[in-house]
From Swiss-Prot:
Record GO cellular component, one term: extracellular region
Domain of life, per lineage: Eukaryota
Protein known as: Acetylcholinesterase toxin C
UniProt note on tissues of expression: Expressed by the venom gland.
SUPFAM superfamilies: Snake toxin-like (SSF57302)
Amino acid sequence: TICYSHTTTSRAILKDCGENSCYRKSRRHPPKMVLGRGCGCPPGDDYLEVKCCTSPDKCNY
């Protein structure tokens, strides 16, 4: 699966992930900003919302 991959300080690159999922991590509370994207599906918490997806490629736009 091809996923977008970046943190708040790096620009987005396309990464070929071994696992079949991508994630997009964002703040749950205003200002709602995207904090990162990458491979896999890490758990969210009270402050972070993590949206995971498995297809198609670049699904974590």
